[in-house]
Amino acid sequence: MRGLACLLAMLVGIQAIERLRLADGPHGCAGRLEVWHSGRWGTVCDDGWDLRDAEVACRVLGCGGALAAPGGAFFGEGTGPVWLSELNCRGNEGQLGICPHRGWKAHICSHEEDAGVVCVGQRAANSREDSMSLLDGDPWLALSGELSPSSEEPPITHAPQPAASSQNGPRKKNPRPPKQTKSTRAPVLTNGAPHQERLRLVSGPHGCAGRLEVWHGGRWGTVCDDGWDLRDAAVACRELGCGGALAAPGGARFGPGEGPVWMDDVGCGGGEEALRDCPRSPWGRSNCDHTEDAGLVCTGPAPRIRLADGPHGCAGRLEVWHGGRWGSVCDDAWDLRDAAVACKELGCGGALAAPGGAFFGEGTGPIILDDLRCRGNETALRFCPARPWGQHDCHHREDAGAVCDGMPLGAVQPTVPAVDSNSTAHRLLSTSVGQMPGPAGPWPPSASPTAPPEPGPEAGSPQLRLVAGPSRCSGRLEVWHDGRWGTVCDDSWDMRDSAVVCRELGCGRPRQPDPAAGRFGWGAGPIWLDDVGCMGTEASLSECPAASWGKHNCAHNEDVGVTCTGTPGLDTISDPFSWSWLPGLGRDQDAWLPGELTTKPSASLTSSVPQKPTKVPGKAPKSTKKWVTKNARRPTTQPPGMPTTKHSRAPGTPTSLHPTARTSELPKRLTTEAPHRQTSHTTVRLTPRVPWEWTSEPVVSQSTQGPQEVTSEATTTENPQTSLEPSGENTEGSLESSQDPATTPTAGVPVPSGPFRVRLADGPNRCAGRLEVWHAGLWGTVCDDSWDIRDATVACWELGCGKVRPRVGKTHYGPGTGPIWLDDMGCKGSEMSLSDCPSGAWGKHNCDHEEDVVLTCTGYTGDDDYPSWTWDPTSGEDLTKGTTVAARPGHTLSWATTTNTEVPSPATQNLPDTDDQGGYESSWTWDTPSGRGLFKGTPTTTKPGSTVTTSTSKSPGHPFPAPRARAGSPRKPTPERRPLPTSATTSSPASSSSPEPSGSRQTSGSWPQLIPDSKQEGTSSSPKPSLLTPGLPSPATFALSTPNTSLLPTRSPELSGSPTPTSPEGLTSASSMLSEVSRLSPTSELTPGPDTTPAPEIIPESSDSSDLPMNTRTPTQPFTASHPTSIPQLNTTSYPTIAPQPTTNPQQPRSPHPATSPQPPTNTHPSSTPATPTESLPSSRKTELSSPTKPRLNSELTFEEAPSTDASQTQNLELFLASESGPSSPSPASNLDPLPTDAFKPPRSQTLHSASDHLTQGPTPNHNPDPFGPCVSPLPPVRVMACEPPALVELVGAVREVGDQLQRLTWVLEQDRQERQVLALGLAQLVEAAQGLGQLSETVKRLAEVAWPPSTPVPMTTTTEEEERPLRGDV
């Protein structure tokens, strides 16, 4: 019975294990292994997991053999139970359940130990999970191009091909097709002459160094070194196949050449594919001779690598070409980081495994490399540290291999082109330079020369398709370009991009895929598009911004899949899981069986999709958002009937500027010499060197591609010498426009400049991360100087990510790399793009990457709320800078402000609150040199057609340096993120409208360097009396905002560190860092907070202020001397009369009797009472009433605009000051010097009488303290406890002593700082005086020159006074 039970259990186990699947892998035969048991999917623990277990699993799954058995949740952590652990297969089992294991149960392994497999074959990622059907035949055959023993060049490894296609010699390759030549360049084609410009290096030490020569017009010529730098050299080295550039010597370093000087003033950006694509002077035009010939020193040919004896071109034994032969790599220190670099160099994506031990068999050649130690971020193995070439201590049984997650993209292009003497376009080398190993001709074509051409899209059909899916409206997205179908990378891909694809294919709307969907297998061929950023309104994917054709950082495991809601067409198959994957074996594309689902649109659906030619995607600027409803661009069955127009990207090409709304490129460095009027239906981004005049007028679109509509058109009047910024790199050499310039209503419009693209990098999603801006072909960051909610609102709006999500603290997404493009952004919050905001010039900043802007947005709204193209970043809420106008469905944020006489379409109606009643429009004018004055902009009213003036000196590189009239209601201008002028420092309007340098003397007396935290709103920049000198009218006066300021919560004439709500906003002590110290001082009585209201019951105690000690020291007052150019000092002392000198006995207890409660009337002056709680200047702190120099200052106190103070408020102040007096605090008169004498100690027996330690808000009844003990005397009602123990009393006393010492130290430092300030002010004034004298002398000299020119003799006439003086000869 036991045997039967075991057999039954085994059968049950086998039945359970028969259902396997691989999840979260790059394809159907790689991923995390999951098993079905007890009605649930679970994972397998990696304890004991090895290649033998993976071999069984791959065989059960029908994926062939096993390549790797990664553990540690390599493909991510799974969910559910961990069903199996400690599998111990031999490798030949037919089922995984036959292998010994620890039983079916939920094991204690965590999902961090989930096992995975990488199998040889591939299946569809969405194929049946429990499918176990084997692939038909052996999908992986031998590689082509075996190396002949006598061959000196390496073979070119192609995609998997049948063994019959192997050759014993090098494969002949067609040359790279020439690019479209510019119309100004027509080289004379002689016998054997190249069809395009070629380069060579002569007179150098090797083939990758020497004098650069160019073939043009049937002759070799040189290049002038004017403007020649490393960026130009990098392009030339790359074109020559010589790696990177080491140096760019000029001055005929490699000897003078012969023939013409073909090129001059070359200005490459470094990213061009060929030197001919760089801006330069016309052919043959130069001001150079051969003593200025340019040269090159390149890094040399890079070694090539390949993966041999593997199942396909992206898995196998790693071999390196060196010394004219292939060799292997030793597996010492070989790991995934090294394999990742090799996979990246091969174009095979990332690394799945790095097997050693000759996993793919032993090599036969030399062992080239050993001890490779890559970091993983290198672009090629040659950049990794390793032993010298050929030095090793290994055997071929230690050969390293790699398994990559990508499939070979057609033929693997070698780094060094192969020599092909039969090629008519091979690279010619100097006869003095020996032939280098490896090819020297152009790279092989993208497709095999023997392969039949791929069938392209049918005439009039979209240039894209969905393949490998269950229907024509679901599958992997492929795009037709350059005669080939290619895939699209899923970087930045979202529902808006899918919406454009579904609309173009006539498949309805996109369907939100579940997490496991969206993958329809790996594509083949090139990856054409990456970083697609559609807005959702485009009629075609070609209108969306994206990276250049073929520029990406992806592998085919990132191919985009799209699922639309449209009804499947006639090519639908019945069972979506009835096909199997079969590689193309190098002959044709990889295909699905039965039948190739390459989704050719059926006849019934052809007329439902738009018919338009394809153009270069990714070049339309972000500002060309078509704020129209989706009905405005419905596909039509009418063919456009307009030929495709190509515009050359070469500079200087006489191309007619007739772009349309889809034009995406323009000639570089194009300069118009004559002014002409330009109109455009899109936002034309021009970089002005002179002011522009913007007018707005309604026009009726003449487009015949859709329903006519009334749109608003921005019209610009261009002045001479207006530079149009290039839009970036275009490797294709040409662009396409979908309209004929001759029939375009907007003929003569300049081509829009390059796209101002933004993105959020390194964040958890596309709407959170570090803000980066695309400029000059590079992504760069934005500095956070002056960045606030208004700038973030514009950025979120432009990204289509809704509103700004409030964050607590700062979210870190890591520092960026590359340049810091923008700084000092100054958006108002209503702009539609960051390019419309004022900022510093491109690349001008004072930041590092620790200050990069990070942004978190709420995300775009769903389709159920608004259409996919509308965003409401601020919901119209009034921001600090002004009200932001938000787009709503059916409205357009129009540039025009005039009311159309015709009935506008819903897509072009202005928002109700975008215009003034009179048709006026709000704009802003900057009048500071940097464009960032104290005010971001002063609101001005501009009529349509008027000029928005600005004197902002912006760099020409900035997209929109000038302010633009924005649609929106006028808003109050606010200062630029600086403390507003407070009542203590009321600056004149002139001083508040323009900033001064930080080092100059500000008229308001505010010195930011003296304020610990000037950015807090509650912090004041009060003027220092040491900076004010009598003799000049004061621009800053002290004014109280409310009559209740007499009740400000100060315990002494000095200010608290933070003002109360009734105080003027932003006004605190100029030395705000002492506010916390003052709370521990004897005068502050350890109050809980600054809002404490004095209790009236302490009033009687302040009458004995004469018993408290008085500091007899008079601190140095360097600021009491008169200064000839300073502002009068303001004395804010509340006691203009000299009080009688009190006794200095520190131990004499204070009398508790209330008979002495009335305050002396001479201690407080009613007119100066309001200033007492708001002034904390050192002059008042360091002034003694007995000092003979201070009464002079008392008369200088003025209160301009101060409200009258009634008697009750004055009495309240007196009561407040009296209540703050205690046994350890001086009287109000003595409080002018907060430094008590060293002999003063707070008496222990009287400590508890200073009951203000525990004051709370609100008055309490009076109590007469009893001096006989702390536990029996009546005390104020608010206390920590009913009877304070002696230990607490001693602690309070000790704290007060510490506060005294801290206060003494603080005031010593303050005095030293004031002396330094006075000295600095004196020096500054001396310098100003010297400058003034110099200017005066220059003025006198100029006047003298005007009065008596050098050619005119000095008149001899003298005045009567001069005649009475004795002449020099008479003396």
Curated annotation (Swiss-Prot):
Top-rank lineage group of the source organism:
Eukaryota
Q: What is its main location?
A: secreted
The tissues in which it is expressed are: Detected throughout the gastrointestinal and genitourinary tracts, in serosal salivary gland, the exocrine part of pancreas and testis, as well as in a few tubular structures in kidney. Not detected in lung and heart (at protein level). Strongly expressed in testis, kidney and pancreas, with lower levels detected in bone marrow, spleen, lung, liver, colon, stomach and skeletal muscle. Very low levels or no expression detected in thymus, esophagus, jejunum, ileum, duodenum, ovary, uterus, heart, trachea, brain, cerebellum and bladder.
Which biological process terms from the Gene Ontology are attached to this UniProt entry? defense response; defense response to Gram-negative bacterium; defense response to Gram-positive bacterium; detection of bacterial lipoprotein; innate immune response; negative regulation of interleukin-8 production; regulation of interleukin-8 production
Compartments annotated for it: namely: Secreted; Cytoplasm
Q: Which UniProt keywords apply?
A: Cytoplasm, Developmental protein, Disulfide bond, Glycoprotein, Immunity, Innate immunity, Receptor, Repeat, Secreted, Signal
User: Compositional bias (Polar residues) spans?
Assistant: 599-611, 653-663, 698-740, 894-912, 1039-1086, 1102-1148, 1164-1189, 1244-1261
Q: Where is this region: Disordered?
A: 143-200, 431-466, 592-756, 888-1270, 1351-1371
Disulfide partners: C45-C109, C58-C119, C89-C99, C224-C288, C237-C298, C268-C278, C330-C394, C343-C404, C374-C384, C489-C554, C502-C564, C534-C544, C783-C847, C796-C857, C827-C837
UniProt-annotated glycosylation sites, renumbered to this chain? N377, N422, N1044, N1131
SRCR domain: residues covered:
20-120, 199-299, 305-405, 464-565, 758-858
SMART domains in alphabetical order: SR (SM00202)
Does the keyword field hold Repeat?
A: yes
| PROSITE patterns in alphabetical order | SRCR_1 (PS00420), SRCR_2 (PS50287)
Start-end of Basic and acidic residues biased regions: 665-676
**Entry GO terms, CC:** collagen-containing extracellular matrix; cytoplasm; extracellular region; extracellular space; membrane
User: Pro residues compositional bias: what residue ranges?
Assistant: 439-456, 1149-1163
Query: Which segments show compositional bias classed as Basic residues?
Result: 622-633
Q: Give the signal sequence positions.
A: 1-16
Q: What spans are recorded as compositionally biased (Low complexity)?
A: 143-154, 741-755, 936-957, 981-1004, 1018-1035, 1218-1230
Q: Which GO terms describe its molecular function?
A: extracellular matrix binding; fibronectin binding; laminin binding; scavenger receptor activity
What post-translational modification information does the record give? Answer: Partially N- and O-glycosylated.
Quaternary structure per UniProt?
A: Interacts with LGALS1 and laminin.
Q: What does this protein do?
A: Binds to extracellular matrix proteins. Binds to pathogen-associated molecular patterns (PAMPs) present on the cell walls of Gram-positive and Gram-negative bacteria and fungi, behaving as a pattern recognition receptor (PRR). Induces bacterial and fungal aggregation and subsequent inhibition of PAMP-induced cytokine release. Does not possess intrinsic bactericidal activity. May play a role in the innate defense and homeostasis of certain epithelial surfaces.
Protein name, entry field: Soluble scavenger receptor cysteine-rich domain-containing protein SSC5D
Which gene holds the coding sequence for this protein? Answer: Ssc5d
